[in-house]
Amino acid sequence: SAVRAAGMEGKVTLACNDLGNNVAREIASGNIAGGGAQMPYDQGVAEAKLAALALLGEETPSYVAVPAETVTHENVLEAYTDVYHVETPDWLKEAYVDNFK
């Protein structure tokens, strides 16, 4: 919105981290080029598995990283599903601009 307020739309390329609803909508409509998204569901699954292994007395790694998802205009609809493990919401499909370049 700061870019819009400054009248700089189309003159500034934006990228971001994390895929909240507002960011997803802006990527879908072409106002943000893309970014990276944490995988909260997958992070929780990894943490639960490690906790279970630790409770069973198994050795667990001291550090575990769940890879981020790269999100672009081309994959934002699928990325939303990957990140949140839900169907792509209608509001996001409606915001998607097919002919964005």
Predicted features along the sequence, with ranges:
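Residue-level detector of short coil/turn "hinge" positions at structural boundaries
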Residues: 10, 34, 60-61
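Hydrophobic alpha-helical
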Residues: 1-26
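Short beta-strand elements at the ligand-binding edges of bilobed clamshell
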Residues: 29-41
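Structural detector of well-ordered beta-strand residues that form the stable sheet scaffold
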Residues: 13-15, 33, 71
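Hinge/cleft segment of the Venus flytrap/periplasmic-binding protein
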Residues: 46-101
